[in-house]
Curated annotation (Swiss-Prot):
Protein name, per record: Small ribosomal subunit protein uS14
PROSITE patterns registered for this protein in UniProt: RIBOSOMAL_S14 (PS00527)
Cofactor: record remark: Binds 1 zinc ion per subunit.
Essential cofactor(s): Zn(2+)
Similarity comment: Belongs to the universal ribosomal protein uS14 family. Zinc-binding uS14 subfamily.
GO molecular function terms noted in the UniProt entry: rRNA binding; structural constituent of ribosome; zinc ion binding
Keywords in alphabetical order: Metal-binding, Ribonucleoprotein, Ribosomal protein, RNA-binding, rRNA-binding, Zinc
Organism: Syntrophotalea carbinolica (strain DSM 2380 / NBRC 103641 / GraBd1)
The keyword Zinc is assigned to this record: yes
Covalent S-S links between cysteines: none
Protein role: Binds 16S rRNA, required for the assembly of 30S particles and may also be responsible for determining the conformation of the 16S rRNA at the A site.
Length: 61
């Protein structure tokens, strides 16, 4: 879990646009972020396995 101070710092508007970085809104993780789903890989996997993401299915071959 991310520190509250880091989540607040990321949410603030920066002086320069390039300094902005994405964080998962569910857990606050800054790495392994998927823009398409707006969350990190861990939360994405958890919600996909629960069936809460429409159109996402587990692949098997």
């Amino acid at each position: 879990m991310a520190k509250k101070s880091m989540m607040i710092k990321a949410a603030r508007s920066n002086k320069f646009k390039v300094r902005k970085y994405n964080r998962c809104p569910l857990c606050g993780r800054p790495r392994a972020y998927y823009r398409k789903f707006d969350m990190c890989r861990i939360c994405l996997r958890k919600l996909a396995l629960e069936g809460k993401l429409p159109g996402v299915i587990k692949s098997s071959w």
